[in-house]
């Protein structure tokens, strides 16, 4: 069998074997994995002499490992396997001849096998495990030492690695094994570490590295005194202090520092932790490391050792976090607290040195502990002088770290990744600065004020010679200053601004505008300038004399040669004029003339091979990005044109001057678009979007806004009616295009704000175009949402138009509701359409337009309408519950609208005042047979769970209201109907229904009924 297994392995891993043979070989090997006897053959293949090929031995060990790990072997078999491997190891690893030992990948697999054997045998059948392998590591036997260290590392990974999730039984087993190791062998293992370090510190760095890594792993779960002693310290300190004359990387030194970090990170009592930090002489170690050539003399050169800086930063971060944790502990004794405060003073300079390191990776490493420190200081009620003195150097380090370094070149394509990483670091630093402000707001205010003030003074002296990085830093701080000066910003939200900070900010803004910084050459500064103007737009409300100058700068910068400045400025220009439209004055003519060269639209169809993974600068060059930016300009034109300072006639003139070229362009491209030309279709799409966006700028208050809307001026409405007509022509001829319909729908929603009631006569055309046979359910839902807004805003004028358009509208919607479903996306769209449909009908009732639904023009749809509402109400599928609730509310409103007056009211002995008199003949019977029935259909649905679902509870509340309403409209007719349906079970229900107007008792009755049916 051994020859058969060996042959199968050779065939399976032989590149020249046929696929058929390989398949047979792998199938055979897979069978071996579940064969309870295969491991015995495999151990022979692994240990035999002369040895089999490496692949045969490796696969043999895998099969053995699988058998051991799956617990397929009994104790006797495990002991036999142990003896076989020990004999093999005795032959192979007891000689100091590297040539005969296994290669690394086989050693790894062998180590795994031995680790599994340790797990199952150490307790009872192999108590000498550690001693057996340590014995092999004696007498300078390097192969034995390496195998011993591999095994120790593997044992930790198997039983003590906290990063691995384990089953409860396995976790208990591992815990027991750790206890057993501590009891039997931990002292021996610790002794072996000192022995190996003593022997190999100046001979074999690989062995030293392995030993240090193992100490770092094991220290988290062993008695710390086994590691923290003079002998071990005497071995570790020289390794930490090793110097490399060549200035190259020293892995041993770095790992030794990491070992100290692991030791420091061990959980222990506060007093013990402080004593340990002192005993380990960590202050001296870190001071010497930071003063060593790799981190001091070679700073700023290619020899600077970033790896060493990072491991030292990890150590300092661990120490500082532990010190802060001790200080936060209210139960710590005074002596320990005093020592911790002294250590805090000792280590803070080292922390700030590493935080200020030119390499951001080093800085990021200590941010967690600095965050911990600032969080602790925020909790201290009255800051002692020793703590207060820490804040200025911390703040200074934070702010200086926000500066672009000397090697950075803003905006270059090949440095975009570095810049993105720096900006991400800036965000983290900003949080730290906020934390400092939360501790001492006045300190931050003074520091930032001085920094910005000094910057403007330097700019006045040096002008264009000033380093852009210093300007950028000061402007960035000015941007952040608002979190001190403005309300509801910063870590501690305030309802009122800080008056001193607000005054300082106003002074900064005045200096900035007066400084001429908008003419500075560097694009980063120009972007900061515009961002600040937009952020602090409220400054210009009280300093309107600055607006013309800033507006002139914006108009100039929207033409800037740098693509990032240019495209970003289009958005910022819109933000600026939109927030200050009441203050900018009559400047539209000048603005339009100045930016008219940026308004012509040139649609470009993206190529199929366009790079989806382009950088931000490249995407700014794309035609699509340029067009999106142009839309900001069109809206900005609308904003500056529609100011209160601009006569209405001029507003209309400006609108016409911008739209006429668009109309002409649309006419030119329409025929080509009808013929299917992709570029022409995209051009018309862009033109429609531009017209809608221009209208959005003119509209002072968006449609649907809760603020009362004024009817737009007739001159403005007339101009945009022309735009609406032009769009409708395009929609009529191109409505099979998804892109065109999407653009038209967007434009329609924006035009509503400037058309006012002039849109109403056009509604049938909009419905015809936007609800074509090509329209998706999603499009129908979005259009219904727009119609809801129109009904709400024009309820006094829309009745006749609604009467005219309702039948074709409902027929389109009914068609969408009845379409077959294909896939999850289709189901989601159908749910949305159901919800918007019943919401639309609800809005009709809420705005007293219910009569339209049963008018002469629409009564033919009445049955379909009610039937569709029933269908939505009864659908309790996931995602449809909200629509069901609205549908039941619609039914309730139908009863109120058409059920006639109440003829009975709840009480002890209610008496009807007369027969039912519905406004629609026969509606009382319709309510009893249909409305009442749909309620009970839902109550009997097994998926209806109002006791556990909030929306279902709301549906139940609507059902209770409907039952009460039907009874109050029909009195005895309802009672007889219920008694015929429920028999004697109806008595309790009717008593609950007829004695009170409150819904809750009836809801509770229904809940009890449903609970009893389970």
From Swiss-Prot:
Pfam families: Exportin-T, Xpo1. It is found in: Nucleus; Cytoplasm. GO terms for cellular component: cytoplasm; nuclear matrix; nuclear pore. InterPro entries: ARM-like (IPR011989), ARM-type_fold (IPR016024), Exportin-1/Importin-b-like (IPR013598), Exportin-T_C (IPR045546), XPOT (IPR040017). One of its GO terms (biological process) is tRNA re-export from nucleus. Keywords: Cytoplasm, Nucleus, RNA-binding, Transport, tRNA processing, tRNA-binding. The keyword Ligase does not apply. The keyword RNA-binding applies. GO terms for molecular function: small GTPase binding; tRNA binding. Belongs to the exportin family. tRNA nucleus export receptor which facilitates tRNA translocation across the nuclear pore complex. Involved in pre-tRNA splicing, probably by affecting the interaction of pre-tRNA with splicing endonuclease. This is Exportin-T. It comes from Podospora anserina (strain S / ATCC MYA-4624 / DSM 980 / FGSC 10383) (Pleurage anserina).
């Amino acid at each position: 069998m051994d020859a058969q297994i060996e042959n199968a392995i050779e065939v399976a891993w032989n590149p020249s074997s046929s696929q058929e043979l390989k398949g047979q070989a792998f199938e055979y090997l897979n069978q071996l994995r579940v064969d309870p006897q295969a491991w015995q053959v495999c151990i022979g293949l692994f240990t035999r002499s002369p040895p089999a090929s490496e692949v045969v031995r490796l696969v043999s060990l895998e099969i053995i490992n699988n058998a051991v790990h799956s617990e397929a072997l009994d104790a006797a078999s495990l002991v036999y396997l142990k003896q076989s491997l020990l004999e093999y190891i005795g032959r192979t690893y007891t000689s100091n001849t590297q040539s005969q030992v296994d290669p690394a990948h086989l050693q790894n697999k062998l180590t795994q096998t031995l680790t599994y054997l340790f797990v199952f045998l150490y307790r009872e059948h192999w108590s000498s495990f550690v001693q057996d392998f340590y014995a092999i590591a004696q007498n300078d036997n390097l192969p034995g030492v390496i195998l011993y260290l591999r095994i120790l590392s593997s044992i930790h990974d198997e039983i003590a690695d906290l990063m691995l999730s384990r089953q409860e039984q396995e976790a208990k087993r591992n815990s027991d094994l750790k206890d057993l190791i501590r009891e039997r062998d931990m002292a021996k293992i610790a002794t072996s570490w000192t022995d190996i370090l003593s022997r190999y510190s100046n001979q074999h760095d690989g062995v030293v590295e392995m030993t240090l890594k193992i100490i770092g792993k094991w220290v988290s779960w062993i008695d710390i005194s086994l590691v923290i002693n003079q002998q071990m310290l005497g071995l570790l300190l020289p390794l930490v202090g090793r110097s490399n004359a060549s200035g190259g990387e020293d892995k041993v030194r770095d790992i030794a520092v990491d070992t100290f970090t692991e030791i420091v990170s061990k959980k222990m009592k506060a007093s013990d932790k402080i004593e340990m930090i002192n005993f380990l002489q960590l202050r001296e170690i870190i001071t010497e490391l930071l003063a060593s050539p790799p981190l001091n003399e070679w700073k700023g050169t290619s020899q600077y050792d970033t790896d060493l800086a990072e491991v030292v930063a990890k150590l300092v971060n661990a120490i500082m976090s532990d010190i802060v944790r001790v200080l936060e502990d209210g139960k710590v004794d005074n002596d320990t607290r005093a020592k911790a405060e002294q250590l805090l003073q000792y280590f803070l300079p080292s922390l700030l040195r590493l935080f200020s390191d030119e390499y951001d990776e080093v800085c990021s490493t200590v941010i967690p502990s600095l965050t911990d420190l600032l969080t602790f200081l925020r909790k201290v009620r009255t800051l002692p002088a020793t703590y207060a003195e820490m804040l200025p150097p911390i703040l200074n380090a934070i702010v200086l770290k926000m500066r672009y370094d000397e090697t950075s070149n803003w905006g270059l394509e090949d440095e975009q990744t570095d810049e993105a990483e720096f900006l991400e670091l800036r965000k983290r630093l900003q949080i730290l600065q906020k934390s400092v402000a939360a501790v001492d707001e006045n300190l931050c205010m003074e520091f930032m004020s001085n920094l910005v003030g000094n910057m403007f003074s330097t700019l006045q002296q040096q002008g264009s010679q000033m380093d852009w990085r210093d300007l950028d830093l000061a402007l960035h701080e000015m941007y952040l200053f608002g979190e001190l000066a403005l309300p509801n910003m910063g870590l501690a939200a305030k309802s009122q601004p800080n008056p001193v900070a607000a005054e300082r900010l106003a002074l900064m803004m005045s200096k900035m505008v007066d400084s001429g910084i908008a003419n500075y050459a560097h694009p980063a500064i120009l972007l900061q300038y515009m961002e600040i103007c937009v952020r602090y737009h409220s400054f210009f409300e009280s300093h309107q004399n600055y607006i013309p100058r800033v507006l002139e700068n914006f108009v100039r910068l929207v033409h800037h040669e740098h693509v990032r400045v240019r495209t970003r400025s289009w958005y910022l220009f819109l933000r600026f004029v939109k927030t200050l439209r009441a203050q900018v004055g009559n400047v539209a003519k000048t603005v339009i003339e100045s930016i008219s060269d940026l308004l012509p639209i040139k649609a470009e169809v993206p190529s199929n091979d366009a790079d989806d993974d382009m950088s931000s600068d490249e995407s700014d060059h794309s035609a699509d990005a340029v067009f999106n930016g142009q839309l900001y300009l069109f809206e900005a034109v609308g904003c500056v044109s529609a100011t209160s300072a601009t006569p209405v006639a001029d507003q209309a003139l400006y609108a016409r001057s911008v739209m006429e070229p668009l109309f002409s362009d649309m006419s030119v491209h329409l025929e080509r678009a009808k013929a299917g030309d992709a570029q022409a279709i995209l051009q018309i799409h862009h033109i429609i979007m531009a017209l809608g966006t221009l209208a959005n700028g003119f509209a002072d208050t968006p449609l649907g806004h809760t603020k009362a809307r004024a009817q737009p001026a007739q001159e403005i409405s007339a101009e945009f009616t022309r735009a609406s007509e032009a769009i409708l022509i395009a929609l009529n001829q191109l409505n099979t295009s998804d892109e065109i319909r999407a653009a038209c729908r967007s434009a329609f929603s924006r035009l509503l704000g400037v058309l006012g009631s002039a849109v109403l006569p056009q509604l049938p055309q909009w419905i015809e175009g936007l609800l074509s046979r090509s329209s998706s359910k999603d499009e129908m839902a979005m259009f219904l949402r727009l119609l809801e807004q129109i009904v709400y805003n024009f309820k006094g004028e829309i009745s006749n138009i609604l009467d005219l358009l309702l039948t074709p509208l409902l027929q389109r919607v009914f068609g969408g509701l009845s379409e077959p479903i294909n896939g999850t996306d289709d189901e989601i769209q159908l749910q949305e359409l159901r919800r918007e449909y019943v919401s639309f009908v609800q809005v009709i009732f809420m705005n007293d337009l219910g009569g339209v639904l049963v008018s002469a023009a629409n009564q033919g749809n009445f049955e379909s309408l009610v039937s569709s509402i029933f269908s939505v109400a009864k659908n309790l599928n996931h995602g449809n519950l909200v629509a069901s609730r609205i549908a039941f509310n619609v039914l309730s409103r139908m009863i109120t609208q058409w059920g006639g007056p109440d003829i009975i009211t709840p009480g002890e002995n209610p008496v009807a005042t007369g027969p039912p008199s519905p406004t629609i003949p026969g509606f009382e019977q319709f309510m009893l047979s249909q409305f009442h029935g749909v309620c009970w259909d839902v109550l009997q649905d097994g998926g209806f769970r109002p006791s556990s679902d909030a929306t279902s509870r709301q549906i139940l509340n609507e059902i209770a209201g409907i039952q009460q309403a039907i009874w109050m409209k029909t009195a005895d007719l309802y009672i007889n109907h219920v008694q015929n349906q429920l028999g004697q079970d109806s008595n309790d229900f009717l008593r609950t229904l007829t004695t009170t107007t409150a819904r809750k008792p009836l809801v509770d009755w229904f809940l009890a009924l449903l609970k009893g049916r389970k």
